[in-house]
């Protein structure tokens, strides 16, 4: 994982202000100031952009400390980076950066372990999503219908998965998407959640079952919740005829609430019984 990432998601090693400082390229610094002026709607002079990397302990630019609206917005909300804000994908303040720096959102929202990378979904993932999601044994176990086409999978990526709390599960060794995990909007259903308590959901393609991937991904998600949010608890559940999913939750600290429910909003038989579990700090 990259370690020198600006508050807005820019990789500092690719930032023109940083490159101009490292190389002494005044023409590049001037051009960057002109571009950033247009993006921000305020005058940014070249001398404001003598940058040593805005996430290091070294000298920060005048632009970063006194002018950057993105940095001020994040700091005002108590965030180290925009990646801690659930509104990042729809935020008008950071939108110019995300538009001109396609990898910024991945830099902000990706995390993982030695084996797994959890990153935002890309539209280019549509074919691999369809490959897994057309399987009639995958979606129905998690309460969603098998996909009927690549176009449907693309639509799901753009309209269901396109948020700051839903991730593709990627095997680092092969750089291959193998499943999904998230909490909040993409997972909401009819579980008996507390106020402001997100619902967690996850799945992996059938060929990756029984390899500990969901357990590892869920543990990573919980670690992110603990370290980067104020969320106090999470709720989830599994169909009683899919106990393996419940074991994943229990391994990660979820405890059965003693409640069972049904969820008419999920795919399939609305009378299927769901066992409810909860994780708490």
Name each model feature, range by range.
Residues 6, 147-154, 243-246:
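An alpha-helix initiation/capping motif
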Residues 109-139, 166, 170-281:
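Acyl-donor (CoA/ACP) binding surface of acyl/acetyltransferases
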Residues 1-112:
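Cysteine-centered metal-binding/redox modules
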Residues 74-76, 159, 174:
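Short, charge-rich binding segments
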Residues 137-158:
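Conserved GNAT-fold acetyl-CoA-binding loop/helix
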């Amino acid at each position: 994982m990259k370690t020198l990432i600006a508050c807005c998601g820019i990789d500092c090693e690719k930032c023109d202000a940083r490159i101009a400082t490292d190389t002494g390229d005044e023409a590049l610094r001037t051009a960057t100031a002109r571009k950033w002026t247009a993006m921000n709607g305020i005058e940014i002079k070249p001398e404001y952009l003598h940058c040593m990397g805005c996430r290091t302990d070294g000298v920060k630019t005048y632009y970063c400390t006194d002018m950057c609206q993105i940095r001020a917005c994040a700091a005002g909300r108590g965030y180290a980076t925009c990646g801690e804000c659930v509104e990042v994908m729809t935020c008008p303040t950071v939108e110019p950066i995300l538009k001109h720096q396609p990898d910024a959102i991945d830099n902000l929202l990706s995390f993982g372990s030695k084996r797994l990378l959890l990153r935002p979904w890309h539209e280019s993932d549509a074919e691999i999503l369809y490959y897994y999601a057309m399987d009639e044994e995958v979606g129905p176990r998690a309460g969603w219908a098998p996909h009927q086409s690549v176009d449907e999978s693309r639509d799901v990526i753009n309209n269901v998965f396109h948020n700051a709390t839903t991730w593709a599960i990627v095997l680092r060794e092969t750089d291959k998407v193998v499943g999904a995990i998230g909490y909040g909007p993409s997972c909401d259903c009819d579980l008996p959640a507390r106020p402001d308590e997100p619902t967690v959901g996850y799945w992996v393609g059938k060929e990756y079952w029984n390899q500990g991937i969901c357990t590892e991904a869920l543990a990573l998600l919980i670690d992110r919740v603990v370290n980067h949010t104020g969320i106090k608890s999470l709720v989830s559940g599994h169909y009683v005829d899919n106990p393996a999913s419940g074991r994943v939750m229990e391994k990660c600290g979820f405890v059965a609430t003693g409640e069972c429910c049904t969820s008419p909003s999920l795919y399939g038989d609305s009378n299927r019984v769901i066992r409810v579990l909860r994780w708490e700090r």
